Amino acid sequence: MEEAAHVKAELRLGTAGWNVPRVWKERVGGVGSQLERYARVLNATEINSSFHKPHRRSTYEKWANATPDDFRFSVKVPKSVTHSSQLAQGELDRFVEESAGLGAKLGVLLVQFAPRKMFVESDAEFLFRALQERTSAALACEPRHVSWFTSEVGAWLRERRIARVAADPARVPDADLPGGWPGLRYFRLHGAPRIYYSAYDGAFLRSLKVRLGAASSSSETWCIFDNTAAGAAIENALDLLA
């Protein structure tokens, strides 16, 4: 596969999934599958479906083979692992083995916690250590409880090389700012004011572009648009490239 040429190497830009609505197919044209066409324009994607159901290793291998050498995937850790009161080690082992089918194109494992999941050091230590013992992929977490957004927890994440997602809209103060390990900056844009549906306007995208430029000058930086419900994600990602 030829390498994606439209995005600077230090910035990973994409959407959650790679569905391209018909209205945007002229901007993401050419031959091939939706993923092949998508990957000619954007250099990253986030696989969210893994949160709800497993995929075969052969499916991950197929996705990897459909993309350029420089393309990278972020994969969301299953909710059976992140939303359980006890770590489901069998589920985690299966997920890691399956997603390893992406090979070198596996860039990040994304851990999203339930909104009521408080920071409990022993629980967090157990989960993140289990992940890091099984994979060399970078880790990003998206907590949604206020207890995760303290300087002490930020330092705890930094020490363990775990990035904290910058999520918009912010559920709690500072949730829209990247935190934790500074070697990875991961932005997730869910859509505002209507989450998953609303497109971001030009003023927001211009401001975001400045933030991404500053972040990517010193860190691997990901920007994933998750406002996919009405097709706004691909529009916003393409406009950010313009």
Region roles according to the model:
Residues M1-A242:
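Residues lining hydrophobic/aromatic ligand-binding pockets adjacent to catalytic sites
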